Amino acid sequence: MENILNFNEPLDINLLDQIVSVLYNPLSNKNDIKAAQMVLGKFQEHPDAWSKVDTILETSKIVQTKFIALVIMDSLIKYRWKSLPREQCEGIKNYIVSLIIRLSSDPQTSSREKLLVNKLNLVFVQILKQEWTTNWSTFIPEIISSSKTNESLCENNMVILRLLSEEIFNFSEEQMTQTKIQTLKITFEKEFSLINDLCFYILENATRASLIKATLETLQRFLNWVPLHYIIEVNGGIAEPSKLVKLLLHKYFPEPLFRNSTLKCLTEIGNLNLGNQQYDAVFIAIIDKFMNQIKFIKPDPSKIPQDYEDGDQGERSFIHTVSLFLTGFFKSHLKIMENSLNIPYLTLAHEILVNISNIDELELFKICLEYWNFLSSNLYSDIATFTTTLLSTPPRLQLYKSVLSKVRVVLIDHMAKPEEVIVVEDENGNIVRETTKDTDSLTLYESMRETLIFLTHLDSENTQHIMLEKLQTLISGREFTFQRLNTLCWAIGSISGAQNKEQEKRFLVTVIKDLLELCQNKKGKDNKAVIASDIMYIVGQYPRFLKDHWKFLKTVVNKLFEFMHESHPGVQDMACDTFLKISKQCKRKFVVLQVEESQPFINELLNQLSTTIAHLEQSQIHTFYEAVGYMIASSSDAAFREKLVNKFMELPNHSWLQIMGAASVKVESLLTVEVARDILNLIKTNNRAAMSLENCYITQISKIYLDLLNVYRTYSDHISRNPNIYRETLGQAMRSVKKETLKLLETFIEKSSDKQVIYSNFLQPLLEAVLGDYRTNIPETRDPEVLSLMTAIITSLKQLVHPEVPKILEAVFETTLSMITKNFEDYPYHRINFFNLIRAINSNAFTVFHNLHPQQFKLLIDCVVWAFKHTERNISETGLHILKELIENVSKNSDVANVFFKTYLVSLLNDILYILTDSFHKSGFALECDILRMMFQVVENGVVKIPLFDPQQANFPSNSEYVKEIVVTFLSASPNVSRPQIQAFVTRLFNLANINNNDFKSATRDFLITLKEWKSHENADLYSDEKNIEKALALKKQSMIPGMVRPNDVNLEMNDL
């Protein structure tokens, strides 16, 4: 095998074919496959491998070998093309062109070698991206000319033009610089007349079906960017479809063989939103022709779902394209279709879309759902600005009234499952607890919920009527299935907040009353479990109603308590989760005395606590305790709060005292698996209570604090004396107790508002118990939660804790570094927690770094560099944040800045340039640009008052010129750009450093694409900032619509009373 790696000898093609055959033969043994992979990998990576490509393509007998050759060529073109001598570029280009012509000119050869020709086309387009237009300005005329010589060759040329269009207009943003993209687009548009004439000639004269289809498919890719006059002609001020578009409408759309490809072209045209009434007649002509044809193709729209079910792939594809055409057309031209002359077609088209929405095919449903969302939000915007006149309903809304009612039915019938529902029907029809989340279903639910909210705003009475009518049908037993009940209840829960309070009250009381009645009447545990989950989901979605209706709220909570005794899988979990949700939103209602009540509900709850939680599992009890904690914390009476906390924690404290009492007599009693697990559950209960009790948890922790630390010490000592015990069940249980203790302390410190009390009364014993143990234990038994706790202490206590930070660093700094710097994989949680700790010190106690020994400070900088060079995204971005904040802090003090930047700026600059230009850290692009810009500002703005260079060894007029030279030297290692290009780029960045951050990023992004010729899938992160801004604007817009923000994400505290 190794003989193919000798590039001084002619390549043995037979041997290469044999090696490739081993790789693709399913009967080959594993060792042979591994050897073949290794040799082929080395062959592909060899810098001269590309020189063997022509030999392989001409003489290899198997297609997989030829594909490997083309992969080698593809890599050369993308990454090394600019470094090749000009004559080699021309030679490669001419060879690929001649091979494509040879293989695609003969119909039989083209068909036989179709896969190879397709791959050659892709390689050729990569060459075009490099060569056109600078070194091959005549490409378009040449490919048009060759197309007229041979129909088979013409067909393949159409494929090449289609691929080129896609590369430039669809996929270019993250592959090429903005300048290059604009140049290619302008050239393509200028020379499109030649392509247009060719397409018109083919479509008017060709008889070869495959050529016509290829032309239509290519034309489709052109239509969303070609100059407008190729689509619309204006004669004497009157606009009409161009000759090419008329061909599509009148010759090819009626023809079944070409109908689908033609409709895809018309879809591209229909999507155009030109904002000019002069062109409206053209779009009316297109929709008229379409609707006239569709009346004959689909005379009964109600049969469309059955046509799809029974149809072949062509039929299904056509219905799919119809949905795209209609939804795209109406998104761009809805208003012109609302003219009285066009209303019949508008109505018919929406009837077709409603029926397509009923097809059981998710992608089709998503297309229609997106349109229904557009239509309903568009009409909602109209209503929001509609001034009431004699008409009670806006005219536009009246126009769509019938279709919107049908859409409501479709969405209610198809409602996706929300996240909160965990009682589901499996594929065998059994009711079970869901074990994994379906993220696609959750995304679909959010889209459907948003659309239903718009639809409810448009006509809440109709929405209610449909839902209640469906509920009555199910209650009567007609058409009852779990699925129908579920989708209806999920839809009911989804419209919370979209009705006024009075409507919501009538609606919800009716729904819950009917569901409770259904629960009573239905026999069987499965039925009751499904109905219980639906009731719990609905009540959890309407906190506003519950807050306003105490008796109903009390009934709901008591019903949840009943469900907590239900053994059916998932019911207890949902009951606890729903109770937690309601407690968060309605907490004050439970601690104040309500009308006609003798005491606040919290008293009743705590008196019956042991009974209520008797059948719950430990994890469910933890959830329950968090829920009750929110209620207690909401009381404004401090004495009452303290009394409640004491009562609330009686059960866990009783168990705790029993265990501690036994330990006081015999400490060994703690050293059993059973006791360790009991302690673990008690600490978890405390942790969840601490989360919700917040500051008033201090009443509880004061009782258990010293015992808690003593247990921690006891388990630490036992593990230290028996280091291998951590592999055993007892050791694992002890470590779990320690970890949960650390989490509880972190929660307590973060949630407490009285930081001085924590510092004075709690901090010293904590540090003594935790830090010494961390420092002296073996690496395998050091808990990453210690680092997280120290981060919380520094972040929460800020200046108070400054005296203790050196002690913290002494215990964890070098100890942790020795664990995490040996490789990039071991101790992943220690890694991220350690760098979060360093960031916390940098942000809250930066002056502590001043007191570090220079060697220690260098170690700190080294570990920050090590962090941002890490391939794990979280760690890398944390390292970048630390460096950014470190530079900000250092720059505030001139003396500190001089020393720091003199010592570290150049090395840090090289490190930042390294990750900016490699392929593994693109997710940090925005932060890397920020840091680079800050470094340039440091030298440009005179933050450093002393020379960064050694005047004895080099003489620069300023620090700026010195840093520019450093950057130019680093970037000059790339063969893809010349030194003058690099110098121009660096000068531009320095000019932008103090002017515009976005321009600085854009310039850097363009240069990196030039530098590396990066592939699109690697470069999405270079645009992450822009995408995040778009998301934020969309969320802000959503928050203005009642009901659009999920009810449990709304802060209702201001209205809690």
UniProtKB/Swiss-Prot annotation:
Gene Ontology biological process terms from the UniProt entry: protein export from nucleus; ribosomal large subunit export from nucleus; ribosomal small subunit export from nucleus
Matches recorded under InterPro entries: ARM-like (IPR011989), ARM-type_fold (IPR016024), CRM1_repeat (IPR041123), Exp1_repeat_2 (IPR041235), Exportin-1/Importin-b-like (IPR013598), Importin-beta_N (IPR001494), XPO1/5 (IPR045065), XPO1_C_dom (IPR014877)
Assembly and oligomerization: Component of a nuclear export receptor complex.
Gene that specifies this protein: xpo1
HEAT repeat ranges per the UniProt record: 239-275, 281-321, 462-501, 506-544, 551-588, 596-633, 739-776, 781-818, 855-892, 902-925, 926-965
Domain of life of the source: Eukaryota
Family: Belongs to the exportin family.
Keyword Protein transport: yes
MF annotations from Gene Ontology: nuclear export signal receptor activity; small GTPase binding
Residue stretches spanning the membrane: none
Localisation: Nucleus; Cytoplasm, Perinuclear region
SS bonds (residue pairs): none
Ranges where the Importin N-terminal domain occurs: 36-102
One Pfam family linked to the record: CRM1_repeat_3
Gene Ontology cellular-component terms listed: cytoplasm; nucleus; perinuclear region of cytoplasm
Keywords assigned: Cytoplasm, Nucleus, Protein transport, Repeat, Translocation, Transport
Protein name: Exportin-1
Free-text function comment from the UniProt entry: Mediates the nuclear export of cellular proteins (cargos) bearing a leucine-rich nuclear export signal (NES).
